[in-house]
Amino acid sequence: MCWTAKSFVRWLSSSVKYYPKDNHLQALCLCTKTKLNKCHILDWSRSPCNSAVPPGRILSWRLFSCKEGTKDLCKREKIASVTASELLYKDLLKSEQENWNKISRSYKAMTKRIKEKIEELHNKYTLHLESPRMRFGGNVYFEENGYILCSKADDDKGNVHILFSTEDMGFSGAYIKRIRISPDERYLATSLQSENSEEATCVIMKLGDVPFVEEVIPNVFSFEWATNDVLYYTSQKNLKCQNVFMTTFTNEKYTKLVYTEQDARFFVDIYCTKDRRFLTINSNSKTTSEVWLIDCRHPFKLPVLVQARTKGVIYHVEHRNNELYILTSYGEPAEYKLMKASVASTGMENWQLVYALEEKTKLIDLEMFRDHCIMFLQKAGYLYLNVIAFVSHSVQSIQLPTWACAFELESHPEHASSTCYFQLTSPVHPPRRFAYSFKENNLIEQAAEEVPIIMNCHTTRLLAKSKDETLVPITVFHNVNSKELHRKPLLVHVYGAYGIDLNMSFKEEKLMLIEEGWILAYCHVRGGGELGLRWHKDGCQQNKLKGLHDLKACIMLLHELGFSQPKYTALTAVSAGGVLAGAICNSDPELIRAVVLQAPFVDVLNTMMKTHLPLSIEEQEEWGNPLADEKCMKYIKNYCPYHNIKPQCYPSVFITAYENDQRVPLTGILRYVQKLRKATLDHASRTRKKGNWIPNIILDIQASGSHCDSSWEDSLNEVARHLAFLKKELQV
């Protein structure tokens, strides 16, 4: 994408730190990824997973009042403690791997059948989808299967030039995360990331008849061209970005540090305004922003502050006609507003309102053009496109097709473009391309004949009344031909953290389940962002239990309305969604028969108590600070999944974890599984009822990949195993 608004809205509105990032927590990537055409030209810098579960690290040893002669003993004790811990970890890891190898045999045949069906749907609906194109001047750039390609915009013969190949350049196995073309198109900068690491490498290519590598910069998160030969970038270390550098590609090459963020709660990245007038250095915590401007006409001058950080105010900056357009939460109500100010007077006291969102409206994305601004909104579960005309000072609202639940904005690097392109989708509807024309003032569906609308699926939008009378949205999908819905299997989805919406983009396996008669329910509980900033605030810190109450109300309403019943109900969650999923297993296990968790965050208290972890301080604005606030500690302990396990009849649980996951350390999941197994066995031994059901607690540890990015094959295998487990547990 061409400017920060897309990533900014998905990131700051959710207060997630490196979005894409799902935060421990954030992972919106539960299911299969596109086998081909995995394109990152549009670059969600805060992609579902750049955000941040604190990676594990051994706590620094503290010596209190060691007397002379005892210091060495303390060291020996420390080494012995660490060694014992490592041995225990290795033993548990080996034991779980052996256990899974035995159990997996019983799922093998069903897993194979599920994989074949998903691949069939993938080949039918998504394999041949065209990669997103980025028009820049007279050329069109796109990425496919590890290649960055270029063609002439007016070439209808399909001629393409290969500019970059991950394999040929020695980056086999890496995927392309981001692409930036210099204004004169002489240079191409791209970042590459492997499945097993969140650290990316930036490769700068000099284009021409024979493109070649000009420079390679390790550990880079975001980067933008200020001029034809001046590149700004942020460095990443331990999942944190706090430094901005400038490097030149002139005759006298040099690199210098431009900006350093001192506050550990803040994460720094950079973007270029749509008209390429300014680079913006964006320093953001989960609730507060500060932006600095670099004039692209004078890229060597010091950055200029827009507005000093003010607690609770998040903002992002665009530029048009010597005015800054500011997307911000400043003012009442505390939802997003579009404001403006002169470049000469950027302080908050000079901000003038342009447009304010209604309450309970989610700003999903925003794109600036020369004379227009387009906002993609969600209200009452439906998507809208609002077009703000700067010249006529008018606002037009267009409701998008009712089947649509998610959208993806295409890249528009030329801000003078007269058309805005985007794709609409839902969990059971493959992406369909649309275009809005500013000149014609109409919405057009592109190539409607290529991807047929799924006709056998019915979408229902419900409202469940939570414990405090708040109405919580639920989106339900089921086959129109299904009868006796109370006997059909139900798969409930939940997330509820960081202001992030549930992932409702197309997944082949979701369509497969619908065809097989399953019911899919997406519970938009508080803590997520489906109803705007307030919805997130009402479900974080001292309000976390509201998300749990919401989830319980949603499941109970579904059952009351005849959508399945407890013995046919399964729950699925990813990363931070594991908090609510794990909590409801403790509080109301009778509502659910089986649970699938992917890299779940299940030990909030222990994680937040360890401030040596890179992201624990940042996470305090989401979960609270239990070290400084005893009330907060007790509150977290009241809902934390790990701390509330007790002997009772639990649902069966299948957990996928990753050995090298930087965001959700495997050690915490191992402890959780051990404690959960013990509780289920204790309960079984106490009750001793004839035919007493003992749930299956399964841990599948993957040696590679992560809950953010996995290869197509790995992701396909994971999904197939999850569904095989659910079918066996629900006996369908």
UniProtKB/Swiss-Prot annotation:
<dbReference type="InterPro" id="IPR002470">
    <property type="entry name" value="Peptidase_S9A"/>
</dbReference>
<dbReference type="Pfam" id="PF02897">
    <property type="entry name" value="Peptidase_S9_N"/>
</dbReference>
<dbReference type="GO" id="GO:0004252">
    <property type="term" value="F:serine-type endopeptidase activity"/>
</dbReference>
<keyword id="KW-0720">Serine protease</keyword>
<dbReference type="InterPro" id="IPR051543">
    <property type="entry name" value="Serine_Peptidase_S9A"/>
</dbReference>
<feature type="active site" description="Charge relay system">
    <location>
        <position position="575"/>
    </location>
</feature>
<comment type="similarity">
    <text>Belongs to the peptidase S9A family.</text>
</comment>
<dbReference type="InterPro" id="IPR023302">
    <property type="entry name" value="Pept_S9A_N"/>
</dbReference>
<comment type="function">
    <text>Serine peptidase whose precise substrate specificity remains unclear. Does not cleave peptides after a arginine or lysine residue. Regulates trans-Golgi network morphology and sorting by regulating the membrane binding of the AP-1 complex. May play a role in the regulation of synaptic vesicle exocytosis.</text>
</comment>
<keyword id="KW-0378">Hydrolase</keyword>
<keyword id="KW-0963">Cytoplasm</keyword>
<dbReference type="GO" id="GO:0005829">
    <property type="term" value="C:cytosol"/>
</dbReference>
<dbReference type="InterPro" id="IPR001375">
    <property type="entry name" value="Peptidase_S9_cat"/>
</dbReference>
<dbReference type="InterPro" id="IPR029058">
    <property type="entry name" value="AB_hydrolase_fold"/>
</dbReference>
<comment type="subunit">
    <text>Homodimer.</text>
</comment>
<dbReference type="Pfam" id="PF00326">
    <property type="entry name" value="Peptidase_S9"/>
</dbReference>
<feature type="active site" description="Charge relay system">
    <location>
        <position position="707"/>
    </location>
</feature>
<protein>
    <recommendedName>
        <fullName>Prolyl endopeptidase-like</fullName>
        <ecNumber>3.4.21.-</ecNumber>
    </recommendedName>
</protein>
<feature type="active site" description="Charge relay system">
    <location>
        <position position="661"/>
    </location>
</feature>
<dbReference type="GO" id="GO:0006508">
    <property type="term" value="P:proteolysis"/>
</dbReference>
<dbReference type="GO" id="GO:0005794">
    <property type="term" value="C:Golgi apparatus"/>
</dbReference>
<dbReference type="GO" id="GO:0005856">
    <property type="term" value="C:cytoskeleton"/>
</dbReference>
<keyword id="KW-0645">Protease</keyword>
